[in-house]
Amino acid sequence: MYSIKQILESRKEIFGNEDYIFEKVNGSFLGKTYGEFVDDVYGFASLLQKEGLVGKKIAIFAGNSYAYMVADAAIMGFVGVSVCISKEWSAESLIELAEQIELDAMIYGDGQKEKVDALRLRFEKIKYIPIETVAGHAPTCELIDDLVDPSGCSKIIFSSGTTGIPKAVMLSQNNMFACWKDLCRRAPLDSSDVDYLFLPLHHAYAGICNFLY
């Protein structure tokens, strides 16, 4: 079975200096190499560890962005449980989520501030982290890289709720990457391939296959 750490390290050896993610910022596309992405993941993971969030449930409540990808990989691989939720959720849904799964922290986008403020009034002990503070932390030797069990829950996603109440689904790294090596053999990728992220990252396909695979 494979883990996020193994995938990041193996891919960094091959694609470390290659462009990995392009994000449109103020009308222009800014590129990040795979090596820069891995460094940002390690840097943010070490910051979350210092904040005492190891083993905790951390929600990501924001639209698609490079910072979202960094946060998701950092939490799942080295910190705790990434709880990915739709940026369209209401304040009432956030409050219900916080109560049901005992949320410990939330990374939120700028457009979600009003909803997050409503949550903050009810749950002062939750740690609130603006998503713009995620990337850019230098990786340090203080990162402990064996705190997360690949067979335990690393990610919680929710069904769409179109036919009823959204249902939480718990995934381990072993679940998520069970087919990773087979896919690499069947559809080998190189730096000339282009993958367009067309779904929100809280979707299972976008957040796993479209991004991490």
Predicted feature locations:
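Conserved pre-ATP/AMP-binding loop-to-beta segment of ANL
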Residues: G16-D19, T140-F158, I165, P188-V194
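Conserved structural elements of the adenylate-forming
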Residues: V38-G43, V169-D190, D195-F198, I208
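Conserved short alpha-helical elements in the N-terminal third of ANL/AMP-binding
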Residues: A74-F78, A206-Y213
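Conserved AMP-binding/adenylate-forming core of the ANL superfamily
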Residues: Y20-G52, K56-S65, M69, A73, ...
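Conserved ATP-dependent adenylate/AMP-binding module captured primarily in the ANL superfamily
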Residues: K87-V116, C179-Y196
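ANL superfamily adenylate-forming
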Residues: G111-P150
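Conserved AMP-binding A3 loop
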Residues: G31-Y34, S154-W180
